[in-house]
């Protein structure tokens, strides 16, 4: 048996704050918190819809609260940030070839955003 002590490097809790890449990563991952609240708000909305018109009106007034509206706006911005980072990463992860040539990265990203805009427009027209 060896009496040698293994080297253990000290790791501070704020190690990520010294590097811009990791700061952005932590910001992007922290956007899940408002999304969780948004999902809970919608779940309670479904529950109030089942309970009846009075509960539904109470939920609608809750959703009109400025704090809840702010949380929903932050959740929307977080979702857009996730979409932007995913769309910009997609051409690097899965390069698309047409007739043996690589499709330009900007075209792939713009096509994804166009699909998001088109689907959003369809949903707005249906609802």
UniProtKB/Swiss-Prot annotation:
It comes from Vibrio atlanticus (strain LGP32). InterPro entries: Fumarate_red_C, SQR/QFR_C/D. One of its GO terms (cellular component) is plasma membrane. Belongs to the FrdC family. It comes from the Bacteria. Its main location: membrane. HAMAP family: Fumarate_red_C. The keyword Transmembrane applies. Disulfide bonds: none annotated. This is Fumarate reductase subunit C. It is found in: Cell inner membrane. GO terms for molecular function: succinate dehydrogenase activity. The chain crosses the membrane at residues 30-50, 58-78, 107-127. Anchors the catalytic components of the fumarate reductase complex to the cell membrane, binds quinones. Keywords: Cell inner membrane, Cell membrane, Membrane, Transmembrane, Transmembrane helix.
């Amino acid at each position: 048996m060896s009496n040698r002590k293994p080297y253990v490097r000290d790791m501070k809790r704020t190690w990520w704050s010294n590097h811009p890449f990791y700061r952005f990563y932590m910001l992007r991952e922290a956007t899940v918190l408002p999304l969780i609240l948004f999902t809970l708000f919608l779940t309670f909305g479904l529950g109030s819809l089942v309970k009846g018109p009075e509960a539904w009106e109470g939920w609608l007034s809750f959703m009109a609260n400025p704090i809840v509206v702010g949380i929903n706006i932050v959740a929307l911005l977080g979702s857009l940030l996730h979409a932007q980072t995913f769309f910009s990463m997609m051409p690097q992860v899965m390069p698309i070839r047409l007739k043996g040539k690589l499709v330009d990265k900007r075209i792939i990203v713009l096509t994804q955003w166009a699909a998001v805009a088109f689907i959003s427009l369809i949903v707005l027209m249906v609802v």
